[in-house]
């Protein structure tokens, strides 16, 4: 779990920096997926970061659509860990949502509000203190590992 938390924390720092740069330019950031493959005999894992395109005029993708896209990708690439970051708008304003999921069952969720004033991002305190276990709550990344948990723990 500590290794996944380290991956997730570094990914989140990168995404926050990208959001800040995008706001300075007056643009948006698409949902981002990072796939991690750990190879036997290699000191470092392989990281692939993908932007998930959002069709113009849609404003965003539903969790079901995102889950389906990620599930199909994960079925082909079989990652050891997936990290997802996306922005969402709530009644209280903008939030950064992040999820982390590995093939051994580690699941973590993050939500952090932020405001944009004159193209400057001010980050609020993370909801629930930061990374947390989502419990029985379904996450977007769960579909990417459907059926793989039992095989990974044998």
Give the role of each language-model region.
Residues 65-154:
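Low-complexity intrinsically disordered segments
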């Amino acid at each position: 779990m500590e290794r996944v938390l380290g991956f997730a924390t570094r990914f989140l720092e990168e995404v926050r920096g990208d959001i800040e740069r995008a706001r300075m330019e007056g643009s948006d950031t698409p949902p981002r997926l990072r796939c991690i493959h750990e190879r036997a005999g290699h000191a470092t894992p392989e990281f692939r970061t993908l932007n998930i395109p959002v069709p113009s005029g849609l404003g965003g993708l539903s969790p079901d659509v995102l889950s389906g896209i990620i599930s199909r990708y994960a079925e082909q690439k079989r990652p050891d860990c997936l990290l997802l970051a996306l922005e969402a708008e709530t009644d209280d304003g903008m939030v950064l949502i992040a999820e982390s999921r590995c093939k051994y069952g580690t699941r973590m969720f993050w939500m952090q509000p932020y405001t944009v004033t004159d193209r400057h991002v001010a980050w609020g305190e993370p909801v629930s203190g930061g990374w947390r276990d989502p419990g029985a709550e379904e996450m977007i990344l769960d579909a990417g590992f459907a059926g793989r948990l039992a095989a990974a723990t044998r």
